[in-house]
């Protein structure tokens, strides 16, 4: 036996033990995604820092806080693509960890100030804007949602609060509302405060809210948002049709003891129905599943398409409609709101879509 040969076996065993204790990485790469995802995601969604969105991880399983500029990233910890970031893994790009970097792009000029591509700024307390390759996109920091009339608040109105940036909705007697103007008119006027759009030489700051939740938990409903993405740069309300899931067989799945099924795709082609009209084309939409543990599943990533409907007497009409890409199950379930969950009336102002 060679000198020192008796120590080689323990060293080899130690190296083997270290490799066994690190199964999550192979040659600098993360282990493949687990299939199925069930059981590995936290029950509650992550609490991200202000301005940091929650996105699905690289496996499409769990919500994680998007990594910001200069932070480490990986397929399971993606960068904030909405902020113009990408995961720079170096020249080899082996699929392992990297650093979130800003995509190259043009700078933006607003109110005499130059902002770099991907840079976020606040022109006022009401708006947060981002420079994206020479274009400025802004989102309101205040809640621009409508407070619809209901039994408890038949005449809502938005007012300014001293010492606070954002307006608040209040409920006042009918006489005071009639003296002060209609609630919708007050809302439309105040929604453009803080940005002077009268100067045609100034940039029109894009302001678009997120789509509201679908008005029905099953069957055809509608959702709304407020935007000024038009030539007049005026705040208008947009509405689209939506269907989270069909109403028939609305039972939580107990397949192999699973508590939730986030997203499921229709096995057969279906036609959407809107009042007495039927979609011309057939679709295989994705629906949000149900849970039997008290959580609810809602759309996480969606897109809007134009659906053509065939109506009685040979008439045709087109309506924007939400299609679901992915859903997420969580405990922050929407509360019942009788003023919001109303039948979709095609003659009402809410149904002008």
Swiss-Prot record:
Predominant location: secreted
SUPFAM superfamilies the UniProt entry points to: Growth factor receptor domain (SSF57184), TSP-1 type 1 repeat (SSF82895)
Subcellular location: Secreted; Cytoplasm; Cell junction, Gap junction
Signal sequence range: 1-26
InterPro entries recorded: CCN (IPR050941), Cys_knot_C (IPR006207), Glyco_hormone_CN (IPR006208), Growth_fac_rcpt_cys_sf (IPR009030), IGFBP-like (IPR000867), IGFBP_CNN (IPR012395), Insulin_GF-bd_Cys-rich_CS (IPR017891), TSP1_CCN (IPR043973)
UniProt domain IGFBP N-terminal: residue ranges: 29-103
GO cellular component: cytosol; extracellular matrix; extracellular space; gap junction; intracellular membrane-bounded organelle
Record domain CTCK: where: 260-334
Domain TSP type-1 residue range list: 203-248
Residues annotated as domain VWFC: 106-172
Disulfide links within the chain: 33-59, 37-61, 41-62, 48-65, 73-87, 79-100, 260-297, 277-311, 288-327, 291-329, 296-333
A GO MF term: growth factor activity
Swiss-Prot/TrEMBL keywords: Cell junction, Cytoplasm, Disulfide bond, Gap junction, Glycoprotein, Growth factor, Proto-oncogene, Secreted, Signal
GO biological process: angiogenesis; bone regeneration; cell adhesion mediated by integrin; chondrocyte differentiation; endothelial cell chemotaxis; endothelial cell-cell adhesion; fibroblast migration; hematopoietic stem cell homeostasis
Cited SMART domains: CT, IB, TSP1, VWC
Residues the record marks as carrying a glycan: 276
Family in the record: Belongs to the CCN family.
Function: Immediate-early protein likely to play a role in cell growth regulation.
Protein name, as recorded: CCN family member 3
Organism, scientific name: Coturnix japonica
Lineage of origin: Eukaryota, Metazoa, Chordata, Craniata, Vertebrata
């Amino acid at each position: 036996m060679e000198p020192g040969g008796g120590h080689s076996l323990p060293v080899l065993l130690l190296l083997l033990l270290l490799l066994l204790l690190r199964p999550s990485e192979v040659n600098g790469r993360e282990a493949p995604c687990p299939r199925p995802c069930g059981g590995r995601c936290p029950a509650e969604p992550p609490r991200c820092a202000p301005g940091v969105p929650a996105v699905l991880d690289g496996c499409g399983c769990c919500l994680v806080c998007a990594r910001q500029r200069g932070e480490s990233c990986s397929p399971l910890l993606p960068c904030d693509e909405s902020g113009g970031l990408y995961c720079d893994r170096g020249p080899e790009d082996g699929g392992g960890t990297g650093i979130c970097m800003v995509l190259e792009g043009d700078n933006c000029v607003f109110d005499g100030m130059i902002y770099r591509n991907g840079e976020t700024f606040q022109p006022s307390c009401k708006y947060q804007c981002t420079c994206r390759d020479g274009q400025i996109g802004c989102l309101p920091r205040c809640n621009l949602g409508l407070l619809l009339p209901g039994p408890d608040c038949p005449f809502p109105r938005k007012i300014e609060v001293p010492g606070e940036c954002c307006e608040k909705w209040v409920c006042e007697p009918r006489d005071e509302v009639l003296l002060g103007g209609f609630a919708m008119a007050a809302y439309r006027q105040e929604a453009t405060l803080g940005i002077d759009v009268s100067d045609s030489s100034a940039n029109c700051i894009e302001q678009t809210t997120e789509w509201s939740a679908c008005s029905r938990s099953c069957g055809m409903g509608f959702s709304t948002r407020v935007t000024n993405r038009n030539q007049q740069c005026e705040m208008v309300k947009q509405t689209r049709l939506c269907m989270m899931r069909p109403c028939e067989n609305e039972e939580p799945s107990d397949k192999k003891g699973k508590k939730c099924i986030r997203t499921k795709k229709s096995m057969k082609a279906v036609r959407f129905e809107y009042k007495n009209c039927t979609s011309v084309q057939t679709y295989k939409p994705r629906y949000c599943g149900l849970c039997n543990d008290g959580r609810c599943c809602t759309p996480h990533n969606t897109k809007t398409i134009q659906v053509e409907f065939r109506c009685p007497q040979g008439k045709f009409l087109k309506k924007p409609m939400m299609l679901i890409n992915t859903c997420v199950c969580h405990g922050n379930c929407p509360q019942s709101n009788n003023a919001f969950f109303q039948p979709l009336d095609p003659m009402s102002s809410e149904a002008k879509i």
